[in-house]
């Protein structure tokens, strides 16, 4: 009887230890190039996402004369990088007042290009991305060095197949990727 209880206890301990090991995630060390946006690949290595330049009729560095809706556009129908719906994204951000975390946004197709809707507000410089196109992230700070934080941006839910961008303040450096039906399975 003691042998049976011992075996049952051993099985329970095995399940508990196994589930704890599975629950732990690999947290990568910060890479040397802090200017790039990274994803964790299948081999648990950080790989940089390619950048594209966004074009827009608005001038985000100028103070807006009126409040209006417009767009940011990326040339081409598809991004070069294809990610899985739950791919982990890592970025360096500045931890200062007025600095914003780059946002994951859903892009819509438009005549061979990809777009996101933006709004400018009278009297302010910059732009706001339409809230229905922002992917709400779970943000986790991993390491901090001075006023720079290495963090993980993870969508709260799996991404649907489509085109996405990670947009910060510099429209010449927009990281893009797509989630295809094949990568979603």
Where are the model-predicted features located?
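Bacterial N-terminal signal peptides
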Residues: 7-19
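A glycine-anchored, Pro-Gly-centered beta-turn/N-cap motif
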Residues: 155-167
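Extended, solvent-exposed segments with strong compositional bias
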Residues: 121-148
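Positively charged n-region of N-terminal signal peptides that target proteins for export
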Residues: 1-6
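Primarily secretory-pathway and cell-envelope proteins
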Residues: 24-128, 168-185
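Surface-exposed coil/turn segments at beta-strand junctions on protein surfaces, enriched
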Residues: 84, 144-146, 159
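Short, flexible, glycine/charge-rich loop motifs used to bind or transfer phosphoryl groups or to couple energy/partner
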Residues: 79, 154-155
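Ligand-binding face of N-terminal immunoglobulin V-set domains in extracellular IgSF glycoproteins
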Residues: 150-152
């Amino acid at each position: 009887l003691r042998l049976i209880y011992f075996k049952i206890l051993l099985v329970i301990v095995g399940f508990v230890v196994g589930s704890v090991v599975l629950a732990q995630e690999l947290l990568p060390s910060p890479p040397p190039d802090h200017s790039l946006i990274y994803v964790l690949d299948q081999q648990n290595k950080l790989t940089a996402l390619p950048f594209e330049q966004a074009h827009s009729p608005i001038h985000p560095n100028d103070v807006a004369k009126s409040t209006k809706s417009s767009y940011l556009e990326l040339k081409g129908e598809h991004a070069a990088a294809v990610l899985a719906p739950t791919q982990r994204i890592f970025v360096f951000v500045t931890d200062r007042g007025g600095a914003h975390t780059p946002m994951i946004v859903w892009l819509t197709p438009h005549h061979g290009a990809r777009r996101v809707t933006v709004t400018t507000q009278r009297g302010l410089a910059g732009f706001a991305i339409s809230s229905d196109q922002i992917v709400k992230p779970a943000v986790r700070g991993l390491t901090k060095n001075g006023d720079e934080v290495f963090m993980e941006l993870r969508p709260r839910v799996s991404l649907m197949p489509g085109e996405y961008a990670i947009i910060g303040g510099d429209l010449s450096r927009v990281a893009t990727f797509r989630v295809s039906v094949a990568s979603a399975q």
